[in-house]
Design a protein with these regions (language model features):
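...with weaker cross-activation on analogous glycine-rich loops/strands in unrelated enzymes
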Residues: 140-207
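SH3/SH3-like (including bacterial SH3b) beta-barrel domains
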Residues: 27-40
Length: 234
């Protein structure tokens, strides 16, 4: 699908824009902690909520909000045609899962570290890697692990197949997610404190190494991606 784009403008008004570069979005107007990232080519909505040198925005593909520095305004371009979500059947998604897995394995081969809020390579957080992997084939997932858990079709651990998502956390909430590879293994981006400070492969077993065992003790369940996310803010 093609979009008609207007020329660059330094101070965009409220409306929909396309990112011309990879951009950082922050979780507060102070812009001290990364919330997420927007890869070049993504669409975002600039709201009327301006505070000093930042503006609140939300990403059109996943409805995720954050704060954007006005210094990044020159990396936005107005879109005259709104973002339109693609639709996929379950069978179409199934055929694309080998490419989703290949994306994560290629990402693991690059020098990387765990980055909270990271969705743009080479550095990702857990759910950012999952979102980027599926987005690489045009399928959009919600941004955070708990949102991805709620979005997928619940399955049992015994039903796991390559390309399914595996969720970890507490009894109250999913705080971590990985992509199942088959034969008990999954790939994920994990942090320094509990994980590998980057992308690695672990096993769903009490017999694995310390990292695998730690996550296995927090295993919540699994989910199957059966559709692409459709924006709710329109």
């Amino acid at each position: 699908m093609s979009y008609n784009l207007k020329s660059q403008i330094p101070n965009p008004k409220s409306g929909e824009y396309q990112c011309l570069a990879d951009l950082n979005l922050y979780d507060s107007p102070e812009c001290t902690r990364l919330a997420t990232q927007a890869a070049s080519g993504r669409y975002l909505w600039v709201t009327s909520n301006h505070q000093n040198s930042v503006v609140e925005v939300y990403l059109c593909e996943d409805d995720y909000s954050g704060w954007l520095s006005v210094g990044d305004f020159d990396s936005l371009q107005s879109a005259t045609v709104p973002y339109q979500a693609a639709t996929f059947s379950e069978s179409e998604i199934k055929k694309l899962l080998t490419k989703v897995i290949a994306f994560t394995e290629k990402a693991m081969q690059q020098s990387n570290y765990y980055l909270w809020g990271g969705t743009v390579g080479p550095n990702y957080d857990c759910s950012g890697l999952m979102q980027a992997a599926f987005a690489s084939v045009g399928i959009w997932l919600p941004r955070d692990a708990y949102q991805q858990e709620g979005f997928t079709q619940p399955i049992t651990i015994a039903e796991l197949a390559a390309g399914d998502l595996v969720f970890f956390g507490t009894s109250q909430k999913a705080t971590h997610v990985g992509l199942y590879l088959g034969d008990g293994y999954y790939i994920h981006s994990s942090g320094k404190d509990q994980g590998r400070d980057g992308i690695g492969i672990d096993i769903l077993s009490e017999q694995g190494d310390a990292v695998s065992q730690s996550y296995y003790q927090q295993l919540r369940g699994a989910g199957r991606v059966f559709k692409s996310y459709e924006p709710q803010r329109r």
